[in-house]
Design a protein with these regions (language model features):
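Short, well-ordered helical secondary-structure segments
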Residues: 8, 12-14, 59, 74, ...
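Short charge-dense sequence patches
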Residues: 1-8, 75-83
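Hydrophobic aliphatic residue packing
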Residues: 10, 25, 47, 89-90
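Short hydrophobic/aromatic-rich motifs at helix boundaries and adjacent loops
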Residues: 20-25, 73-74, 100-101
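N-terminal capping segment at the start of a domain
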Residues: 3-42
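Active-site metal-coordination/substrate-binding segment of hydrolases
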Residues: 80-107
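A non-catalytic alpha/beta surface segment that caps or lines the substrate-entry region
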Residues: 34-79, 102-103
Protein backbone atom coordinates (compact mmCIF):
# COMPACT_ATOMS: atom_id res chain seq x y z
CA UNK A 1 0.00 0.00 0.00
CA UNK A 2 1.36 3.40 -0.94
CA UNK A 3 1.56 6.36 1.45
CA UNK A 4 -1.13 8.25 -0.50
CA UNK A 5 -3.45 5.25 -0.22
CA UNK A 6 -2.91 5.19 3.55
CA UNK A 7 -3.57 8.94 3.84
CA UNK A 8 -6.76 8.60 1.78
CA UNK A 9 -7.94 5.69 3.95
CA UNK A 10 -7.32 7.70 7.13
CA UNK A 11 -9.16 10.70 5.72
CA UNK A 12 -12.08 8.53 4.60
CA UNK A 13 -12.42 6.88 8.02
CA UNK A 14 -11.71 9.85 10.31
CA UNK A 15 -15.23 9.94 11.78
CA UNK A 16 -15.17 6.19 12.44
CA UNK A 17 -11.75 6.50 14.10
CA UNK A 18 -12.97 9.35 16.31
CA UNK A 19 -16.15 7.46 17.19
CA UNK A 20 -14.11 4.44 18.27
CA UNK A 21 -11.75 6.65 20.26
CA UNK A 22 -14.77 8.21 21.96
CA UNK A 23 -15.91 4.75 23.05
CA UNK A 24 -12.55 4.11 24.71
CA UNK A 25 -12.11 7.55 26.28
CA UNK A 26 -15.52 7.21 27.97
CA UNK A 27 -14.27 4.32 30.13
CA UNK A 28 -12.57 5.13 33.43
CA UNK A 29 -9.77 2.59 33.10
CA UNK A 30 -7.63 3.47 36.08
CA UNK A 31 -6.17 0.62 38.09
CA UNK A 32 -8.79 -0.87 40.38
CA UNK A 33 -9.18 -3.61 42.93
CA UNK A 34 -8.42 -7.03 41.42
CA UNK A 35 -11.44 -9.33 41.22
CA UNK A 36 -12.33 -12.65 39.64
CA UNK A 37 -11.39 -12.41 35.96
CA UNK A 38 -10.28 -8.78 36.34
CA UNK A 39 -6.63 -8.77 37.46
CA UNK A 40 -6.35 -4.97 37.21
CA UNK A 41 -9.88 -4.15 38.34
CA UNK A 42 -13.13 -3.41 36.56
CA UNK A 43 -12.09 -0.35 34.52
CA UNK A 44 -9.12 -1.93 32.73
CA UNK A 45 -11.20 -5.05 32.01
CA UNK A 46 -13.99 -2.91 30.51
CA UNK A 47 -11.67 -0.91 28.27
CA UNK A 48 -9.85 -4.05 27.10
CA UNK A 49 -13.19 -5.65 26.22
CA UNK A 50 -14.29 -2.51 24.35
CA UNK A 51 -11.01 -2.25 22.42
CA UNK A 52 -11.23 -5.88 21.36
CA UNK A 53 -14.89 -5.37 20.40
CA UNK A 54 -13.88 -2.46 18.16
CA UNK A 55 -11.16 -4.60 16.59
CA UNK A 56 -13.72 -7.38 15.98
CA UNK A 57 -16.03 -4.86 14.30
CA UNK A 58 -13.15 -3.79 12.05
CA UNK A 59 -12.58 -7.38 10.91
CA UNK A 60 -9.64 -8.36 13.09
CA UNK A 61 -9.28 -11.69 14.87
CA UNK A 62 -8.96 -10.86 18.56
CA UNK A 63 -7.59 -12.67 21.58
CA UNK A 64 -8.14 -11.75 25.23
CA UNK A 65 -5.48 -13.25 27.50
CA UNK A 66 -7.40 -13.58 30.77
CA UNK A 67 -7.97 -9.79 30.91
CA UNK A 68 -4.25 -9.20 31.42
CA UNK A 69 -3.89 -8.06 27.82
CA UNK A 70 -5.22 -8.75 24.38
CA UNK A 71 -4.28 -8.47 20.77
CA UNK A 72 -5.82 -8.16 17.33
CA UNK A 73 -4.47 -9.68 14.17
CA UNK A 74 -5.33 -9.76 10.50
CA UNK A 75 -4.05 -11.95 7.70
CA UNK A 76 -1.88 -15.02 7.60
CA UNK A 77 1.79 -15.71 7.23
CA UNK A 78 5.00 -15.78 9.17
CA UNK A 79 5.90 -12.09 8.95
CA UNK A 80 4.11 -9.82 11.39
CA UNK A 81 4.12 -6.22 12.50
CA UNK A 82 3.55 -5.67 16.21
CA UNK A 83 2.37 -2.46 17.84
CA UNK A 84 2.26 -2.32 21.63
CA UNK A 85 0.12 0.08 23.62
CA UNK A 86 -1.91 0.40 26.77
CA UNK A 87 -5.45 1.45 27.65
CA UNK A 88 -5.23 2.07 31.38
CA UNK A 89 -5.01 5.61 32.73
CA UNK A 90 -3.76 7.46 35.78
CA UNK A 91 -6.41 8.94 38.11
CA UNK A 92 -8.20 11.82 36.35
CA UNK A 93 -7.96 14.31 39.23
CA UNK A 94 -9.94 17.54 39.28
CA UNK A 95 -8.00 20.06 37.19
CA UNK A 96 -9.60 19.35 33.83
CA UNK A 97 -11.04 22.05 31.58
CA UNK A 98 -13.22 19.41 29.90
CA UNK A 99 -14.68 16.14 31.13
CA UNK A 100 -11.73 13.68 31.01
CA UNK A 101 -14.06 10.86 29.95
CA UNK A 102 -15.57 12.69 26.99
CA UNK A 103 -13.77 13.14 23.70
CA UNK A 104 -13.53 16.87 23.02
CA UNK A 105 -12.74 18.26 19.59
CA UNK A 106 -11.63 21.84 19.09
CA UNK A 107 -11.31 23.61 15.77
Amino acid sequence: MKIMDIKEKIHATTEELLSNMERLVAIDSQLGTPAEGMPFGEGPAKVLHEALQIADELGFKTVNLDNYCGYAEMGDGEEIVGIAGHLDIVPAGGDWTYDPFKLTREG
